[in-house]
UniProtKB/Swiss-Prot annotation:
2-oxoglutarate binds at R169. NCBIfam families: PRK05467.1-2, PRK05467.1-3, PRK05467.1-4. Fe cation binds at H96, D98, H159. Its EC number is 1.14.11.-. Signal peptide: none annotated. Binds 1 Fe(2+) ion per subunit. PANTHER family: PKHD-TYPE HYDROXYLASE YBIX. This is PKHD-type hydroxylase Swit_4046.
C-alpha cells in the first residue's frame, strides 16, 4: 500500500527542522548504504549521530505520533531514527530496494523494514527533477509532494530518485517496522478502520453496528499483530 500523508510538519515546526538541517554539515550519502545502494547512490546526507539530525529527527518522531493517518496506515511498532538527504547538481539515486533489516550503528537497535517513508522538506517548485519513482504490481508511480507532506510505501518496492537538475531537494527518510508484517493484511485493516470512521461520523460511535465492526477490527489486529 502506498499512501500520501499530508501535513506531518507545518508552520514554525517545518521551518525549524529545515533551518536545523540546512545549517548543518553534510557528508557523502553512502554513509548508510548497503552494497547495492552504494553503487546507485549519488547524494549528500546528514551524519546520523550529529546534533542536527538527532534534534530534527526527534521533532519528526513527535509529529508522527500526533498524525492519526500515519498510525492507522503504518500500525508502527518501531521507527528508525529519521535520516536526512540532499540532492542537487544532477545528484540522483538509481533503482534499488531497501535492506530488509536496518541497524543503528553502535547500538543494538534494529528493525525489520516493512515500510519506507520520505518526508519532503522543501517546496516542489524550488527544484526540478528529484521525483521519487516507486514500482509496484500496479505500475510505476512518480511522487513529488509539498513541504511537510510524506509518502509511505512498502520497503520491498523497487524505487529510485531522478536527477535534480535545478535547485536542491531536501528530505527526511526512514523505515518502519509495523505490528502487522503482511502488506495485504495491513491494507485490509486500514480500509476497515477508514470505513468505520466514515460511518461513525454519520451514525455515532455508540451505534451498535459501529461497536461490532470495531470489535472485528481489533480481533483481526489481535490475530495478525506482532507486538
Amino acid at each position: 500500500m502506498m499512501i500520501a500523508i499530508p501535513g506531518v510538519l507545518s508552520g514554525r515546526t517545518l521551518d525549524h527542522v529545515r533551518t536545523l538541517v540546512t545549517e548543518a554539515e553534510w557528508v557523502d550519502g553512502n554513509a548508510t548504504s548497503g552494497h547495492q545502494s552504494a553503487l546507485a547512490k549519488k547524494n549528500r546526507q546528514l551524519p546520523e549521530d550529529g546534533d542536527a539530525a538527532r534534534e530534527a529527527g526527534g521533532i519528526i518522531l513527535d509529529a508522527l505520533g500526533a498524525t492519526p493517518l500515519f498510525i492507522a496506515a503504518a500500525l508502527p511498532l518501531k521507527v528508525f531514527p529519521p535520516l536526512f538527504n540532499l540532492y542537487g547538481g544532477g545528484e540522483r539515486f538509481d533503482t534499488h530496494v531497501d535492506n530488509a533489516i536496518r541497524m543503528k550503528r553502535g547500538t543494538d537497535f534494529r528493525i525489520r523494514s516493512d515500510l519506507s517513508a520520505t518526508l519532503f522538506l522543501n517546496d516542489p517548485d524550488s527544484y526540478d527533477g528529484g521525483e521519487l519513482v516507486v514500482e509496484d504490481t500496479l505500475g510505476t508511480h512518480k511522487v513529488k509532494l509539498g513541504a511537510g507532506d510524506m509518502i509511505l510505501y512498502p520497503a520491498s518496492s523497487l524505487h529510485h530518485v531522478t536527477p535534480v537538475t535545478r535547485g536542491e531537494r531536501l528530505c527526511s527518510f526512514f523505515w518502519i517496522q509495523s505490528m502487522v508484517r503482511d502488506d495485504g493484511a495491513r491494507r485490509t485493516l486500514f480500509d476497515l478502520d477508514t470505513a468505520i470512521q466514515a460511518v461513525a461520523a454519520d451514525r455515532g460511535q455508540d451505534d451498535p453496528a459501529i461497536i461490532r465492526l470495531t470489535g472485528v477490527y481489533h480481533n483481526l489486529l489481535r490475530r495478525w499483530a506482532e507486538a
